[in-house]
């Protein structure tokens, strides 16, 4: 791999001796007044939080809208999603939501945000073809004590799926609605900061309980 790099590019083999982590490298190379741009939609909240708390100089962290930079970027995949038949997994979405809400109540949480696709696939029994070689659908979700919202890209679901999820107490909403809906949350919200992206995290305007997604247990 090192032989294929352009001149001036150095390969940093993470995990090797004397090779710093990305966070440590940035902390050691950014000076007062420097500006570090990042895409909050693909950068985890935990990475930016750790970078902010660990810095020793006064550099600025700036979330950049990459649509202004990558103007000819291909659209996200919009492959149709589908519900995984209960005979293959044994538990309905409603049953899983009841279990998650029990965990939320034990920890005094009013809401739970899930952004990791494997956790969403398990919780909502949803599958798709948006990720090559992986049965995942592009999605976000918010679960409250009374409601559940599944955020899917327009055109990836149909009326049959809407009705099926409605029977399990789930409302399908547009993919990008997650941001403003997050801002409306109140009380305490359960999030996995190592999974949620910084853009969604920045919209949280209430108390945060940091922890792994219950669906991981």
Residue map of PLM features:
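A composition/biophysics-driven feature that prefers long, compositionally simple stretches
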Residues: 1-217
